Amino acid sequence: VTHDHDGAAEVADYLQTLGHRDIAVITGPADYRSAIERTQGFVGALAKRGIELPKARVIEAGYTFESGVAAAEKLLTSKKRPTAVFCENDEMAAGVYRVALRTGIQIPQQLSVVGYDDSPLASRLWPPLTSVRRDTRDTGRIAAAMLLQSGDAARPMASVRPHLVIRDSCQPPQ
């Protein structure tokens, strides 16, 4: 079991701690469990800190680079753009980087960006992307070991907690 809810809540806490209050989220597809958990975790953690996300700051996308570009165009070309964007995967975050570059918005000086999954792409973007790491190798290794150990017996649940990998894509808002 992965704890997408907790990973997204950690992002909300981090951005709020930096001083961001005008935050947007680019979600995955509404029918994906991971997107539901990430969105609930993120929005819930912000609400606990007194930050409500307007509907215009929550944009559903498709976990692709192209959908990240489309969502970022809506967010970053509006008169009042957010100071931070949480993307529920790194591909969509790369789409935000593309639009920021094209529109002259500097990351992180004018816009903080956080991704999810900590894919190899996260460390290759410039500046390197802050992202939530889900140790999928550990998850697979644990699951395989549990299958081998349990045979036909009831299988216990294993969980791997995500954690935020802080790189250079965030700073306090100007």
Residue ranges of predicted features:
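Bacterial carbohydrate/catabolite-sensing allosteric modules
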Residues: V1-Q174
